[in-house]
């Protein structure tokens, strides 16, 4: 019961934030801002729903804007940060896959060429790669993946 209420609240918060964003955000920043909100919503749901696995879900801060405007961008690239890396990597194997890679996209967002390369590399390595556009899709993806442990 509690987890259902939490799920509903998270989805409602995500939807309200997306409506506010569409009404207030400058046009060119909409997709990135929506993806940030989606990522935060997904991460909070995951941490509440699966606290035992929270250390196995990771995000590398390699967002395009961060890399373009961050003074340390060159240093981060030299240290191994790469364009196109999935938004989340879940390092828990199930019966079918050794890990799960999740790319978050806004409703109209599309993969970059670098992200398509990562998708191919993940799938070639035997991992599962999923593109998620809503918090609800993220929940279904994680729950389905964990059913096969």
Annotated model-derived regions:
Residues 2-149:
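Catalytic phosphate/metal-binding cores of nucleic-acid and nucleotide-processing enzymes, i.e., regions
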């Amino acid at each position: 019961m509690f987890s259902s209420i939490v799920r509903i609240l998270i989805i409602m918060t995500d939807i309200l934030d997306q409506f506010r964003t569409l009404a207030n955000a400058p046009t060119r920043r909409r997709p990135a801002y929506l993806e940030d909100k989606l990522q935060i919503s997904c991460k909070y749901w995951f941490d509440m729903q699966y606290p035992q696995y929270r250390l196995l879900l990771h995000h590398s801060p390699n967002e395009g804007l961060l890399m373009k405007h961050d003074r340390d961008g060159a240093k981060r690239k030299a240290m191994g940060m790469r364009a196109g890396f999935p938004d989340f990597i879940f390092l828990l194997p199930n019966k079918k896959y050794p890990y799960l890679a999740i790319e978050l996209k806004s409703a109209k967002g599309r993969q970059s060429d670098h992200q398509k390369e990562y998708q191919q590399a993940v799938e070639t390595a035997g991992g599962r790669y999923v593109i998620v556009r809503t918090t609800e899709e993220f929940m279904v993806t994680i729950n389905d993946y964990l059913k096969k442990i």
